[in-house]
């Protein structure tokens, strides 16, 4: 767990800033956003605040019942909110394809894509597509989803003349990936699996994905940015696989952890704030640009991951 700072950075915000505070005065009316993992935690709060600012938010969720509860709660507080949900399981490539097909065929525009869903430090398990579950859910699912939605985002950007933004919710845990960064030849190696390093590997992949995506978007000459971020360590059901961590959180959590309102702040800042206009390929923490690791800025590693991911989704 990483304690956050209440000292304001150059953006004027800090780790104690909330999602409402970092978006104060911003009008997102007319924008459409997708938020994955929106049925709980920072995903639900991100959805609420984007809707509060006027955006039409599509929740990509595994649990449609939980999504309805989130939507009902938001509408109770914000009767004018525009919130919908489409079923999405990021660990299943078929589910990702189905979600993208349904959204793309709806004719809706897409201004903002927030790749937020994730699982943390779970025991070794393979996804339905025979990919290590954390890598499959946290990276590969979002990688495919982004690629499948990109044409719609490009069309929206051209027609609206508004900047599109892709936001990858990574983590400071990317600093604790395997020593080589991404173990391309051992993704599914159970014998050497470490649940925390595998989580770090998947979060490093989120950072590298945004960096390489930035390169492609600039080459295409489209007005879409891609950034990654650390939301801060908060109490969410990410910790459901680790009872020891849950116990520790109950004892000292309030001293070092953000609440959900603070945890969603950096996501909402990167997604909406005018200070971030034109900024791409950066890593943010506490609503400020933050330094990543040498692996996190490794252009060769980013390209290798991109090519590896393309080949992996093609095989499935």
UniProtKB/Swiss-Prot annotation:
What processes in GO biological process is this protein linked to? Answer: protein transport
Q: Which residues form a coiled coil?
A: none
Task: Locate the residues binding substrate.
Answer: 171
Q: Does the keyword Translocase apply?
A: no
Q: What class of enzyme is it?
A: oxidoreductase
The active site annotation covers 193
Q: Where in the cell is it found?
A: Plastid, Chloroplast inner membrane
Which residues hold NADP(+)? 37-43, 89-90, 116, 137
Listed under GO cellular component are:
chloroplast inner membrane
Q: Give the Pfam families listed for this entry.
A: adh_short (PF00106)
A single GO molecular function term of this UniProt record: oxidoreductase activity
Task: Indicate where this protein is primarily found.
Answer: plastid
**What keywords are annotated for this sequence in UniProt?**
Calmodulin-binding, Chloroplast, Membrane, NADP, Oxidoreductase, Plastid, Plastid inner membrane, Protein transport, Transport
Region Interaction with calmodulin: list its residue ranges: 298-314
**UniProt keyword Transmembrane helix, yes or no:** no
Report the function annotation for this chain: Involved in protein precursor import into chloroplasts. Part of the redox regulon consisting of TIC32, TIC 55 and TIC62. Has a NADPH-dependent dehydrogenase activity, but only after preincubation with lipids.
Q: Which family does it belong to?
A: Belongs to the short-chain dehydrogenases/reductases (SDR) family.
Can you state the subunit structure given in the record?
Part of the Tic complex. Interacts with TIC110 (via N-terminus) and with calmodulin in a calcium-dependent manner. Interacts with TIC22 during import into chloroplast.
Q: Which PANTHER family match?
A: SHORT-CHAIN DEHYDROGENASE TIC 32, CHLOROPLASTIC-LIKE (PTHR48476:SF1)
Domain notes for this protein: The N-terminus (1-10) forms an essential portion of the targeting information.
The miscellaneous remark of the record is: NADPH and calmodulin binding is mutually exclusive. Dissociates from TIC110 after addition of NADPH.
Name of the protein described by the UniProt record: Short-chain dehydrogenase TIC 32, chloroplastic
